[in-house]
Structure formats: structure tokens, C-alpha cells
Design a protein with these regions (language model features):
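Short, small-residue-biased leader/transition segments that mark boundaries at the very start
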Residues: 1-5
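Inward-facing hydrophobic residues that define packing positions of alpha-helical scaffold repeats
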Residues: 32-40, 72-74
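Short, charge-rich amphipathic alpha-helical segments embedded
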Residues: 44-45, 85
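Helix-capping and short linker residues that terminate individual alpha-solenoid repeat units
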Residues: 40-42, 81-82
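Alpha-helical positions within canonical tetratricopeptide repeat
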Residues: 27-31, 68
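Short coil/turn linking the two alpha-helices of tandem helical-hairpin repeats
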Residues: 43, 62-64
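"A position-specific structural signal for the A-helix of alpha-solenoid helical repeats
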Residues: 8-22, 48-62
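C-terminal non-catalytic interaction modules
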Residues: 65-162
């Protein structure tokens, strides 16, 4: 296959991953993750690689895989840092998952922690250099879903009506 057809195939599988993620079908999302991880995304599509890595962290958070998360966080940070650029968006999210999230006990404390992260990311989102990192993955919608205790699909529907 040509480079273009490979890119299209990867984008299709990323779209499926993101769709399963939005619908909270994490088992199917993990299957798409595994499929995408077979490719050297870092060489093919750097933006896709970064988004897949961050979504992987969040899926495992959603699945309550607390024992696996510290290892995944280190691995994702290392992978993104090796890619010659680490967006502030990525650094802040990884730092939050590494340091702040494990300290949160649930309920109001969780909502406050996610709100604090949302405020940090909202400031970053306005930076011209950082905007590209927000295109592939709507982290703001996911954070709002956590703060408002709503399904991600509902939050996205409210933001982008049909």
C-alpha cells in the first residue's frame, strides 16, 4: 500500500478508537489501540501517535486500572518526550495523571481536581503552538464529562449540536 492509503487506514482506525471512546465502549477501544500500536505511528503520523498515547492513558483510567497506570504514564511520557517535541498540553495532562490524580479520593475532590486541570488546559488551548494538540482529541469535553458527571457523548452533543 502507498503511504497515503496507509495514512487513511490509520486515520480510520483512530476514528473507530475515538468513537468507541466517546461511547464508553472501552473493550472495543482497547482492540483499536492494539491494532494501531502494531504500526510505527511515530514515523507515520506524529499527531496520531500522541493522541493514541493520551487516549490509552484515559481509557485505562476509565477502566480503573490503577495498578497499570503508573507504568503506562511513565511509558507514554518517555515515548512523547522522545518524539522531539512535547506539547505543554501533553506535559500538563501527564503530570496531572502522575501526581494529582492518585491523591484524589473521589466525589467532590475528583471534580475539583478535574476542574483545576480544565482551567490549566483552557489557558494552554489559546496558545497558537498548542492548538494543534487539541484538534485530534477533545480533552476539554472529556474533563467536562468528569466534572459534570455526564457521559462524554452527552457533553460532545451539547457542544456540537447536530
Amino acid at each position: 500500500p502507498t503511504r497515503r492509503s496507509s495514512d487513511l487506514l490509520l486515520e480510520l482506525h483512530f476514528s473507530l478508537l475515538y468513537l468507541y471512546f466517546i461511547y464508553a465502549d472501552y473493550d472495543k477501544a482497547i482492540k483499536q489501540l492494539k491494532f494501531l500500536e502494531q504500526f510505527n505511528l511515530r514515523q507515520l503520523k506524529q499527531d496520531l501517535f500522541a493522541s493514541v498515547q493520551l487516549i490509552k492513558l484515559i481509557i485505562h483510567y476509565e477502566l480503573d486500572n490503577r495498578n497499570l497506570l503508573p507504568h503506562l504514564i511513565r511509558s507514554v511520557y518517555r515515548s512523547l518526550n522522545e518524539s522531539a517535541r512535547l506539547f505543554e498540553f501533553e506535559r500538563v495532562l501527564i503530570q496531572f495523571m502522575r501526581s494529582d490524580l492518585p491523591k484524589v479520593t473521589g466525589g467532590i475532590a475528583t471534580a475539583r481536581a478535574f476542574n483545576k486541570l480544565l482551567l490549566q488546559l483552557t489557558k494552554i488551548q489559546n496558545d497558537q503552538y498548542e492548538q494543534a494538540a487539541f484538534i485530534m482529541f477533545d480533552i476539554v469535553a472529556w474533563l467536562r464529562s468528569k466534572i459534570e458527571h455526564k457521559p462524554l457523548l452527552t457533553v460532545i452533543s451539547e457542544i456540537k449540536p447536530a
